[in-house]
Amino acid sequence: MKRPTSSSRKSKKQGEDLAFSEEGSLPAVTMEQKDEAEMEEVDDEEEEEVDEDMAGGHAAQSPSPSCGLGEKKRRLALEQVRALERSFDTDNKLDPDRKARIARDLGLQPRQVAVWFQNRRARWKTKQLERDFAALRAQHNDALRADCDALRRDKDALAAEIRELREKLPTKPADTAASVKVEAGNDAAAGAAAATVCKDGSSDDSDSSVVFNDEASPYSGAAFIGFGPSFLVDDASAATVGCSSSLPALESKWHGPYSDDSCKGGVYGFTEEWLAACSGEMAGNDAAGFFSDEHASNLNFGWCASGNEGWE
């Protein structure tokens, strides 16, 4: 057997690399690309470390514990940091000419100056936002407090007004209720009086037999008291005396209920002699026409004491 030569080994290695790239669908990484990636990582680490160690006493170099190649960290001196702060307070924007001048004066690289300004602007923006937020919050709290105080004052004023109105309300309803009660009492009294009059002077049963009370009937003996001559006197006292004096004459002429035959000649309870005497006494008066012959026929009633016979 022949031993494999160096050329065959190289071709075999290239074939393996190509197969790996085809299987993983990834391009083959060359040595140049690896070197460029390592340089970019180193630059990023330097940018982060410049801002973290800018408060150091003087420029010092120390080996990185995480890096096995023994790379050095660069720290900014206190004088350098103060000079950069003064430059930032003057103008936080950094142009290329100014960046080169600051780096030359402080003995730094232009890239270090650019990274420091970038980080300082980020911190300045954060602090500015915090200050603005604190100012807005204080202003908002003051406005809310003022609005709350105004609302409380309005609430107290409205509560006082409500109390005043409530104190005034009970008087008017009480007067109204009292007037309503008085009117209701008057209406009830009037209704009771009307009911009493109807009960004493009228009869609910119109179909029943006609029965009159001697005192309430218009044809009773009390209704004819005072028909004598003394009743026509103008004086009220004389009329009263006439009524009382005519009572014996009325009693003398009253004979009570008569029989059926006596009812045919006159009115119920009165005789023709008594009516003639009354008409003769009042012949000279104006009211005598009430008992004249033509009106006397109207006083003849057709019922008798028994009430069994009809009109005649």
From Swiss-Prot:
Region span, Disordered: 1-74
GO cellular component: a single term: nucleus
Tissue and organ distribution: Expressed in seedlings, roots, stems, leaf sheaths and blades and panicles.
Gene Ontology MF annotations: DNA-binding transcription factor activity, RNA polymerase II-specific; sequence-specific DNA binding
CDD domains per UniProt: homeodomain
SMART domains tied to this protein: HOX
KW Transcription (keyword) present: yes
Family per similarity comment: Belongs to the HD-ZIP homeobox family. Class I subfamily.
Function (record text): Probable transcription factor.
Name of the protein this chain belongs to: Homeobox-leucine zipper protein HOX13
